Amino acid sequence: MSYVPIVVEPTSRGERAYDIYSRLLKERIIFVCSTVEDHMANLIVAQLLFLEAENPKKDIYMYINSPGGVVTAGLAIYDTMQYIKPKVATLCIGQACSMGSLLLCGGEKGMRYSLPHSRIMIHQPSGGYKGQATDIEIHAQETLKIKRLLNELYSKHTEQELKHIEKSMERDNFMSPEEAKKFGLVDNIMSSRDAMTLLAK
């Protein structure tokens, strides 16, 4: 089991201990820092809804370091980001690949960032199925539907032509932060917190 640091804060009722992620949640910071799957997605969605209920007018900051994962789990997070009232700023730390890159570019326009040495990757969805031929055909058709949906979402958030997105997504497409900015996945590259503070003003 991985170790999660604990921070202790003094309160009027004595000291209170938080795991580091819960403490950062108090500052409206959410971490998407693992493979995207259903349990993890449910936790992220719950945090987004909690922060909206706490203050629907205050921005949320989502830090992303993810290799991607299950498409439906990623779409659950993405849809919630679009659904809630607060603006969601996204910041890539390390990597934002596959569904991680969709979450990155799905942040509020003008508030999508990357650190200077992160890697961003987009590609078409993949899947493996076995069984009767008819069932395999059904799953293949569903995969093609998801492929079209993802292409449309990337086109929407990057403001690029759908045909260009389709071509760019055909194989694993790795980008530097500069390339991701040119592509429209992020708006700015942050080398220091001061730079983000200046942009926020």
Swiss-Prot record:
The active site is at residues 98, 123. The keyword Magnesium does not apply. One of its GO terms (molecular function) is ATP-dependent peptidase activity. Cleaves peptides in various proteins in a process that requires ATP hydrolysis. Has a chymotrypsin-like activity. Plays a major role in the degradation of misfolded proteins. Belongs to the peptidase S14 family. Fourteen ClpP subunits assemble into 2 heptameric rings which stack back to back to give a disk-like structure with a central cavity, resembling the structure of eukaryotic proteasomes. This is ATP-dependent Clp protease proteolytic subunit. It comes from Rickettsia peacockii (strain Rustic). The gene is clpP.
